[in-house]
Amino acid sequence: MSITDLSPTLGILRSLYPHVQVLVDFADDIVFREGHKATLIEESDTSHFKSFVRGIFVCFHKELQQVPSCNQICTLPELLAFVLNSVKRKRKRNVLAHGYNFQSLAQEERDADQFKLQGDVTQSAAYVHGSDLWRKVSMRLGTDITRYLFESCSVFVAVPPSCLFQVCGIPIYDCFSLATASLGFSLQSRGCRERCLGVNSMKRRAFNVKRYLRKRKTETDQKDEARVCSGKRRRVMEEDKVSCETMQDGESGKTTLVQKQPGSKKRSEMEATLLPLEGGPSWRSGTFPPLPPSQSFMRTLGFLYGGRGMRSFLLNRKKKTAEGFRKIQGRDLIRIVFFEGVLYLNGLERKPKKLPRRFFNMVPLFSQLLRQHRRCPYSRLLQKTCPLVGIKDAGQAELSSFLPQHCGSHRVYLFVRECLLAVIPQELWGSEHNRLLYFARVRFFLRSGKFERLSVAELMWKIKVNNCDWLKISKTGRVPPSELSYRTQILGQFLAWLLDGFVVGLVRACFYATESMGQKNAIRFYRQEVWAKLQDLAFRSHISKGQMVELTPDQVAALPKSTIISRLRFIPKTDGMRPITRVIGADAKTRLYQSHVRDLLDMLRACVCSTPSLLGSTVWGMTDIHKVLSSIAPAQKEKPQPLYFVKMDVSGAYESLPHNKLIEVINQVLTPVLNEVFTIRRFAKIWADSHEGLKKAFIRQADFLEANMGSINMKQFLTSLQKKGKLHHSVLVEQIFSSDLEGKDALQFFTQILKGSVIQFGKKTYRQCQGVPQGSAVSSVLCCLCYGHMENVLFKDIINKKSCLMRLVDDFLLITPNLHDAQTFLKILLAGVPQYGLVVNPQKVVVNFEDYGSTDSCPGLRVLPLRCLFPWCGLLLDTHTLDIYKDYSSYADLSLRYSLTLGSCHSAGHQMKRKLMGILRLKCHALFLDLKTNSLEAIYKNIYKLLLLHALRFHVCAQSLPFGQSVAKNPAYFLLMIWDMVEYTNYLIRLSNNGLISGSTSQTGSVQYEAVELLFCLSFLLVLSKHRRLYKDLLLHLHKRKRRLEQCLGDLRLARVRQAANPRNPLDFLAIKT
């Protein structure tokens, strides 16, 4: 094994751990208390053992503090059992315990013998338990060191030629977040960076200032922490045995975990555990003292699916006491916000029972808040700001008339603002400045997308703490930094509760907030009355299709205890409501059911991988579409002929699948493997991307046991993946491995969920007698298997080498040179296929030929010219050349702000860069950039439009930066970001063409580097010049670079670039909003 093969993988470990050593070097540094050094390798050892210990890497955060003994106190199996039982009992994160579950024993029996395994061992524990090599390592290092390795270190085993897998320790994927994972990786070559015209000198000048500020901030944070955790407030911190902080070095980008070890704790209790890197506000999470402001977030997901009325509003809830329930008082609210959290209402009380003097002085103010809340006319304010229009006289109005009646985020903000003015006493704001700033944050929060969040640090930005006299114990005298820090923490807790508890709770009480199918991630706010009418009309339409049968109370009572009841909800579409059925719950029964659903999905995928014909013409995405079109496009370009296109969309595909046909199809899939044993492995993969930094992915994989007998343990599995070329320079962490599932188990569970599908809507319960739930993870595969079976029966004569049929779940596309085949396909599907529940939506049928019989029978059929750009699933296909373009008409009237979730994080600039790089990787797909399937003109046009949309995304991200950050404050960084994206785009274009395009900066190849760079300049100049004041410095550099590129490009290539960029602002981009 060459160390050079492992060097990139070891670089990942060194970027995350301060100490990384080979086990041999780790052992050489140990001196036992008996006076001699540890000897891991002896001359008589076999080469196999020497190779084994040299392939083990030990990573740790802090060196061993106590002097260990060399004594062998217990055997390796006993020590392993002790560690596993301890980890499970203390609920610590350790890879060694993955797959180890306690048996159903009483607590007394579990604690009786800690040296005995209380369950089956699999995965890492089984690998160590059954290894003679690990037993020899344990004997030579002694029990103390072996236990230290298992409990406090992260140990990785090398698998030649270039990968590692983790054996024990906190999972490596928990040691970094994607928000900061891109640090420490250079994206630009030196030559490219020198083109930034003085950018590096600007960065150097900024670095010294940042280093000084970072040092000051670290010192202040340490003082603040000491003050905040002093006295009575230290009580909760002492409950945690060890806490860890994440500290980042801005220059190297390494993450160091620093252990804090209370002196009163024993060594055995000082194992490293990770506190949450982020979480919710303390009043909701119950974490006191609260997390640092930059790690505490309010999420817009909290708005969703409310509409339960004011009775559920926090300030209207009652406190549980020994005498019963009573209304909350001022001191109760103080305890909820600053001490106990929402669990206080359920009777939870912590010390101190008597409020400290500072908080006791706040009681009158919070009592006034509650009095003003009880007098506040919420209904009148709601009707004033978000009035209902014609809802009482609607009667049996159409569903489409209610869909547009949602309240804009600005109207909701006006309502919330009126309520805050009426309820919150002026003294709590401190000043008009603070109140106006807070209102601005509330307005921003209400306008945010579904997955966005706001940190307490951002909420507190520019708030003047000293204006709030209610925070002070003494109104006069000197204010030390620690006191100011504590006041800031208290104000942060209050403002976080005011947003997450009061504002979010008020919105949930008065509105039903939901996503919509048309606006990606945008949140719609419906008044309760409107949503109730919408939901009622949608449900009537849904149940009229005969897909569900209502159960009587007696039938509901007779349901087996194992029955899982799903919930039905609706999501607004442009012209209707989409039913979504989901299983919601965190109890053991629900978790087991969801686990079985995932297992069924994995086993069906394994069957499909072994017999792809089961899926018929199914394509799962752009990669599959590219593979299909690559088989016919070259021949069409070489010898053009008329092609006939048919696009069909099934109406209600999931809900219309007949159960008898589904059972028949799945029986045919699983019957050949009824007695086959499946292995299901879930693992995490961590790797370093040269352009996007550290990345992680979580993968589930199912295989047949018989075909993978040589890949049972992780080392064998990793070796197999590398031999197949599927993996290199990666770290794997096994999470779950099971090998006890058979095909008959999957068939039995499928039959059970199909015949026993019970759905609850409101107070009524129904049994689904047709179709599959649209929200289930397995529904898409079931739908594709059913339609694949239909295609194999009905269309086997139509599909041949010259024709191709593709189907993305329920969207069909036929491309054929035979007009008769196209007409036959059209007639069959227009007539419907009742045995498969297939009914075509006539409004979504598109063809590029005249068929008078079909046109008469289907008046909504859309006929395009023989030669045109044919739309299908977000693509435009040239019917003559088979060139493929992206269809940007779907972005019309949509705001790009909702298609991106930048988030509030420590390094917003790095997060922005990671987001934009990730989007480039997804959008620069070979489907649009492959010269074998697309003409050069089409590729240039695709690149320009892709980059134009990317420039719009860049602008949206730049406007979303927190803390008043802007491009104007650091143009050097954002200019480098643009050049990094140029290089990455060029790399992706080369990757899509397997070397057909030269990646050098010389003028060779069909699409050269300078051409891509010029397209970047043109697209970014077009977008950013509309906001000249914001991007003045960037525009100057982009104009200079554009002129230089136009001079160095030849006439033909420059003409090709200008052809792609004409018109500069395409028609389909005019309706895109930012």
UniProtKB/Swiss-Prot annotation:
Q: In which tissues is it expressed?
A: Detected at highest levels in gill, ovary and testis, and at lower levels in brain, eye, heart, skin, spleen and stomach.
Query: GO molecular function terms here?
Result: metal ion binding; telomerase activity; telomerase RNA binding; telomeric DNA binding
Q: What is its main location?
A: nucleus
Q: Which residues form the Reverse transcriptase domain?
A: 552-877
Q: Entry's CDD domains?
A: TERT
Membrane-spanning residues:
none
Function comment? Telomerase is a ribonucleoprotein enzyme essential for the replication of chromosome termini in most eukaryotes. It elongates telomeres. It is a reverse transcriptase that adds simple sequence repeats to chromosome ends by copying a template sequence within the RNA component of the enzyme.
Family (UniProt): Belongs to the reverse transcriptase family. Telomerase subfamily.
Official protein name in the record: Telomerase reverse transcriptase
Give the originating organism.
Takifugu rubripes
Q: Which gene encodes it?
A: tert
